[in-house]
């Protein structure tokens, strides 16, 4: 019988493993917002699989649908062939998500991960424009494959490529330019000035909230300005909603409050409902220009994820979940503001929006230490930002009041303990 012992992982698993170092236990069961390890210790999950478990662990309706599908010998693997499960997912996505929002997109299944979705959007934007350069933004994160890394800002991640990452240009995200806080004017000058050295891009790729980059949240005004820049210059707009989408910020798509219409939308993580690998790329019909098989892959048709993903879409047949997320988001915001006020020694700044919020502190290792103390007390939470300077709250969007308050209480305890023990010195 497996014991709560990490020796097999430490001895045989690659050194590249990361999350197990921050959460050093062997997990065994999970339900809703709770996890249990082999010792029976219970944890509140404010991590949600980095956004892959927006609906929590083992949602009962999704689980029963999947068990029935397996018991009936439903198709498991089918590449991009037509299956009943796939057809039902496409139909539900059209009728529950796209049509009520007056959105017109073709649905591409590029592979199982968010990076696959990003790669497909980059390739297609370059194909339809005939240009190679793509503009990304400071602190953006889009995946670990070469194309996705090329539009990622994090130096540590980029160095892992082992080769030059070319045909991309990085411009300042909203509020990155502290001195003027007007990155739009800066971006326009770079695009229009013949001496800037910036080749006309095929596309801009942007996140509305930079989940890995430090929970930087772009304003709706800034996003609308980015869309306007693209439209006026025949530049395609790729919206990476892999982490911020599927309800994480309150609305199904994180860009809905801004009222913009991207040319390509990248979705993965929670699109499969229960954490099963699935990615889709939404493509404006006029740019659906790949020839059959021009972008393919073995795992484009995860039927298990189609089954659970279809069931998950039922949450969006009315506005109850959306309103619930928005109400609980206000509770998270008020809690974080209260912690910043009570502990000025953190020099904290609240970041993000919706169910992806946190506190940034310039105090070295503070966010890491708070996340570590949370784990000791039974709360799973990670950090974000180029220097891991943000501790990041990512509860399931289906969490109830009891679960949310329990998690916030543990976090408050961790903040109080760490700030009391530490000699806090800003970086």
From Swiss-Prot:
Its EC number is 2.6.1.76. GO terms for molecular function: diaminobutyrate-2-oxoglutarate transaminase activity; diaminobutyrate-pyruvate transaminase activity; pyridoxal phosphate binding. Keywords: Aminotransferase, Pyridoxal phosphate, Transferase. One of its GO terms (biological process) is ectoine biosynthetic process. The modification N6-(pyridoxal phosphate)lysine is found at residue 269. Its cofactor is pyridoxal 5'-phosphate. It is an enzyme of class 2 (transferase). Pathway: Amine and polyamine biosynthesis; ectoine biosynthesis; L-ectoine from L-aspartate 4-semialdehyde: step 1/3. SUPFAM superfamilies: PLP-dependent transferases. The keyword Transferase applies. Pfam families: Aminotran_3. Belongs to the class-III pyridoxal-phosphate-dependent aminotransferase family. This is Diaminobutyrate--2-oxoglutarate transaminase. It comes from Marinococcus halophilus. The gene is ectB.
